[in-house]
């Protein structure tokens, strides 16, 4: 399952690790254009991390134009 192979370490902030992981999955084509990402709440439960870490990772990816959000619909790969 996607996201099950992410191992969180203490070497860098959690949100940075999540951001890098998502960038890799997108680059490899495992998260194709316009595919819906899990909600921040759902992904925080899957990864067993703070929802704020997911929000920070998503915000950074949005600011770089890698993902986008549609109000009431979710977050998608750009």
Feature map (PLM): residue ranges:
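N-terminal basic, amphipathic alpha-helical segments
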Residues: 1-78
